[in-house]
Amino acid sequence: MSLQRRRVNKTAGNETVGGASLNRSDEEEGMTHKVAYDPEEQKLRENTREPTLTLMEEVLLMGLKDKEGYLSFLNENISYALRGCILIELALRGRIQVVDDAMRRRFDPSERLIEVVDGSKTGEALLDEALTLMKGSEPLTIVNWMDLLSGETWNFLKINYQLRQVRERLAKGLVDKGVLRTEMKNFFLFDMPTHPVADTSCKESIKRRILSVLVPRNVELQYTELFPETVAFKYLRTIALICSAHGANVLEKVLSTLDYEKRDRGFSRAEELLVQFSQYPFALDKDIETGISVNLNRLVQEELDRNPGTALNLEVVAGVLKVYSRMDDLL
């Protein structure tokens, strides 16, 4: 089955940071009226297996200009890539998985059906909104969901599946988490909100985590309060971050501080990871030709051993990375 994206007209305010204000759903509005004790919120607070920042927030942060507080207007990839990040995040949190059908191996990883297996809230508004949409739908393929969440469909019966104002909502979430701040700036006679970086140490720690995989011979992750050592799938998360940043055309910003040779080898390693992890089972027996992060395969295998019963969840990750590997053809 060929992999195609179909475009429909979207309003300019749907995606640009600083666009039109968010229209909250009734459910989201209701979240502002909190009861004294919510067992589900208590469970979320006690859960140390998830990082403070989602994969989508990390990718957006890598693309933002630190002082200006907005993304490059020329970046056409990031909106679509962020929808893939949503699917990866839901899969790593155990909410969705590939439908367990023996016939699925006949199809490309991106063309395999996915289903909701845990409909409980994550505490992240965008993830929960996507999860609600998926719960109310028949199983669709990974690339179908990326198209629908992006509004890239000719099926007008499913146009309401589009997640709107994703970049602006992610930026506001980072403001709430103390990573960004909001400033009003003038663009062509209009005042619009921008979100400069408030906590540079957070962004720098994410960059260091990426570079720890793309530069040295051996991986050694550095942990922070926002990304503690207790996080589940910390190596797979970092690989997904690198591949998502590559697909979103923001990886270059991370590698720009390196000299030419290291930058070139870093890109080569990122592309090597994209090929290796866009199939399932992951190609952990593949020789690492770049000679970078040579211990990564072993570390990932140890993660898989510590998390049995997650194969169908991780197959979603592989399917999204497969879409990223074809981004140049899609756009």
Curated annotation (Swiss-Prot):
One MF annotation (Gene Ontology) recorded for this entry: enzyme binding
Gene of this entry: VPS74
Protein role: Phosphatidylinositol-4-phosphate-binding protein that links Golgi membranes to the cytoskeleton and may participate in the tensile force required for vesicle budding from the Golgi. Thereby, may play a role in Golgi membrane trafficking and could indirectly give its flattened shape to the Golgi apparatus. May also bind to the coatomer to regulate Golgi membrane trafficking. May play a role in anterograde transport from the Golgi to the plasma membrane and regulate secretion.
PANTHER family in the cross-refs: GOLGI PHOSPHOPROTEIN 3 HOMOLOG SAURON (PTHR12704:SF2), TRANS-GOLGI PROTEIN GMX33 (PTHR12704)
Keyword Lyase attributed: no
Subcellular locations according to the entry: Golgi apparatus, Golgi stack membrane
Binding site for a 1,2-diacyl-sn-glycero-3-phospho-(1D-myo-inositol 4-phosphate): 83, 164, 167
Subunit structure, as described in the record: Homotetramer.
Region described as Disordered: spans on this chain: 1-42
Domain of life per record: Eukaryota
Protein's UniProt name: Vacuolar protein sorting-associated protein 74
Family indicated by similarity: Belongs to the GOLPH3/VPS74 family.
Protein's GO biological process: endoplasmic reticulum unfolded protein response; Golgi organization; Golgi to plasma membrane protein transport; Golgi vesicle budding; protein N-linked glycosylation; protein O-linked mannosylation; protein retention in Golgi apparatus; regulation of phosphatidylinositol dephosphorylation
Main location: Golgi
